[in-house]
Amino acid sequence: MKKEKHLKKIISICIFIIVVQGVFLFYSFFFQSKESIYFDGINAIRKNDNYYFAVGSNNDNDKHYEKAKVSVYDEKRDKLFEKLYNVGFNSAYFGACIEDNGLIAVGSYEKTKKDHNALVRRGLIVRYDYDGSIVFSSEFKLLDNTKFTNVISVEDGYYVIGQSIYKSTDFGNEQGGGILVKYDKKGNVDWYKSLGSSKEGIFNDFYLSDDFIYVVGQLNDNVGVLCKYKLDGELIYQKEFDNNIFNSVYLVDDYLYICGSSDSSALLLKLSLEGDIITSSYYDKVSNAKFNRIIYDDSLIVIGSSFNKNYDGIIVKYGMDLEELSAVTYGDDKNDYLTDIIFDDGNYLVVGYSVYEDKNYLSKFIRYSEALKVLGVEK
């Protein structure tokens, strides 16, 4: 029985790796091709008292290049304007944060024709004012393929996380993998730290407390990682978790909550601040599931996706000891991807994108009640 169970786990991991690599190759090919398939996706949503800010990408141009975008909406979510990052070739934003006088967006872009032909990107951080004008933009390239996944603003600058690896067969560089970069307010690099290898590793999300930075991601295709850093970048600890992938982290009442996946099940963990697991919960009601994002509002809310012929979104509410309170799936269209969630005026606002029968990808807003009832969908 143990041998059979171990074999099933290995098969599940192999299937997951194949799916992930397949998605990456499709993504790269999709935006290099000149097909007329339309793509418009939202990867992150932020809100202040007056506006909603969504970042992502679309390919609404003659050459069908993917272009990083910032979209600004009023309180009724009517779009006021949208700005594309029209530098280089393909680009995308994956994370954002709001400041008193503007927005910071982070992602990646192909700067040169050589980058474009090699399918490699540079990390990108851009500061916008509230009118959508660029205040500064700065690139980061440790190894030949780099992207930023999230950003947090602090008084003296910005913390940014992501990945920098060799896409080619190059070896020999001890740096690379997941990256943590500290910028000043003008977009200059103060310092950076890397963890992993020159071929693997990524930081997907982080949480900033008063004195420490908690970062989650993966070292390779099936090893999740939790790191605790001082604010100056000194590594306090690195904890590795086999057969796991970590996508998001939140800190509540001196406990860390991390979501992601384990084999073919979505995963939620409760840990001490020293990185020791207290309890875990596996969401296996649907096949090939993963959690992408976690937030807190009296309870834990996680969003993610599952795959069984088509991709469906999932949203689950948990108590603080990881007892499941309610769960729903979202599958109105052929494929549905939920990418981010915020608490908004007593409800939950979820963003993402869907693939329709005509093969076009369109972004959407989905508003849920606290009881996880769909109140409205806006495309």
Regions found by a protein language model. Give the residues of each.
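Helix-centric, low-specificity signal for extended rod-like, repetitive segments
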Residues: 1-2, 14, 115, 360
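N-terminal Sec-pathway targeting helices
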Residues: 2-21
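A sequence-level/structural motif corresponding to short, flexible coil/turn segments enriched
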Residues: 21, 25-379
